[in-house]
């Protein structure tokens, strides 16, 4: 089976386990992008600790869930956003968050992954890859 979007698969796994009320989720395969997105989600308080498990093939990530995620997912197609777009949140980005101050958009910038709030502070644009609220 071919897996086309590992980030979308990881976020769907987290959301499904959160809806079921599970306390942890196992994400496979693991990647640096998924680990960086989880680090941002952990810093914002959406997930707890996570650890990499080497299984000899692709690796797995075990994530402790805190029950604070209402919805999360990958943004497809990836949307390019400028600094000015982040200030106003245009319609094609507004549909991912329930309100301007609720939730986060995860942006891939030239300075690494960050939330849309950090991107506004640093005055950089990038590509929106995921949302969490």
From Swiss-Prot:
Belongs to the universal ribosomal protein uS8 family. The keyword Metal-binding does not apply. The lineage of its organism: Archaea, Thermoproteota, Thermoprotei, Desulfurococcales, Desulfurococcaceae. The keyword Chaperone does not apply. One of the primary rRNA binding proteins, it binds directly to 16S rRNA central domain where it helps coordinate assembly of the platform of the 30S subunit. InterPro entries: Ribosomal_uS8, Ribosomal_uS8_CS, Ribosomal_uS8_sf. Keywords: Ribonucleoprotein, Ribosomal protein, RNA-binding, rRNA-binding. It comes from the Archaea. This is Small ribosomal subunit protein uS8. One of its GO terms (cellular component) is ribosome. It holds the Pfam family Ribosomal_S8.
